[in-house]
Design a protein with these regions (language model features):
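Generic "edge-of-domain/loop-turn" microfeature
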Residues: 40, 86, 124-125, 161, ...
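Short intrinsically disordered coil segments
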Residues: 48, 94-96, 132-138, 169, ...
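A short acidic/glycine-rich loop-to-helix N-cap element
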Residues: 42-45, 105, 220-224
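Ordered, small/hydrophobic-rich secondary-structure cores
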Residues: 2, 13-89, 96-98
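Short, surface-exposed loop/turn motifs that are enriched in glycine and acidic residues
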Residues: 142, 154, 158-162
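Short amphipathic alpha-helical segments
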Residues: 39-63, 160-188, 228-237
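Short, well-ordered beta-strand segments in beta-rich or mixed alpha/beta enzyme
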Residues: 28-34, 64-95, 116-117, 146-156, ...
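Glycine-rich beta-strand-turn "strand-cap" elements at beta-sheet edges
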Residues: 2-25, 61-73, 101-145, 182-207, ...
Length: 260
């Protein structure tokens, strides 16, 4: 199932005191939607106007919304929860509530597929603590927020092992930070049963998700061109990988709380 959009102006709306921040979310979804041609900004406008505060009112956290810079038909967002049971309760409340009932047809009309969803948890305590959560502009803003988020899905042969996570902490993360990433976070597959089966998630696979926030697109390009990852990380990482990683360059929407 879907729901997405974008909107906002230049009046800041602070994240409420009751809202959790990235490191307070033991359960996170990475949601990637494939849209009909020309419909991404239509969905972003709707999402940012109607589906941010109304979801958070049910106890979840909309962590960030993004355009995939290399896939014009892709909208990507992150959503966090306090637990799997909290996820069930929040999603039941939202998807059975008046906001979704009023806008679901418009949202669904933009989408080809909304089932590409990874259910994740922080890879270790504090692994997501570096992700910033900024105050949002008021609904009505357009364009984009600063920075670019490099999101890489590493497909693994098995669940992330202590040895892999040690390599992640001491080789992968420092390489990104030396290469200009301002903030880095890591998630791995949450293996609990989907508590809200109305919204499917990808099952039967093991992943490590790396999020690296760069201040500018040029900074990410400079890191990529440096080949530091290819030299210092890729050879050591290869034995854990089942196939080539998925790499996404994500531009925050105007109302994304996660941006540079």
């Amino acid at each position: 199932m879907p729901y997405t959009a974008m909107a906002t102006r230049h009046t800041s709306v602070p994240i409420t005191a009751a809202a959790v921040v990235a490191d307070d979310c033991p359960i996170v979804e990475l949601r990637q939607y494939t849209l009909h041609a020309g419909q991404r900004d239509v969905l972003i406008d709707l999402f940012d106007r109607e589906f941010v505060e109304t979801q958070e009112a049910q106890g979840l956290r909309v962590l960030g919304q993004f355009r995939d810079l290399d896939r014009p038909d892709q909208f990507v967002w992150l959503r966090g929860f306090g637990s799997m049971e909290a996820r069930r309760q929040a999603l039941e409340a939202f998807y059975r509530g008046p906001t979704w009932a009023a806008h679901r047809n418009a949202a669904n009309a933009t989408m080809v597929d909304s089932d590409n969803v990874l259910l994740l948890r922080p890879a270790w305590p504090g692994a997501a603590g570096a992700l910033p959560q900024h105050a949002r502009p008021a609904a009505g803003a357009s364009g984009s927020a600063p920075g670019v988020l490099a999101a890489t899905v590493f497909h693994l042969h098995e669940a992330a092992t202590p040895a892999l996570l040690d390599f992640c902490r001491h080789r992968m993360a420092p390489t990104l930070q030396r290469g200009g990433a301002r903030h880095v976070a890591w998630y791995c597959t949450e293996t609990s049963a989907n508590t809200f089966p109305r919204l499917p998630v990808r099952e039967g696979e093991h992943v490590l998700l790396g999020l690296a926030l760069f201040g500018r697109e040029a900074a990410l390009e400079a890191f990529t061109d440096s080949a530091a990852w290819a030299r210092g990380v890729a050879p050591g990482l290869a034995p854990w990988l089942a196939r080539a990683p998925e790499i996404h360059r994500l531009q925050p929407t105007a109302r994304s709380a996660l941006h540079a």
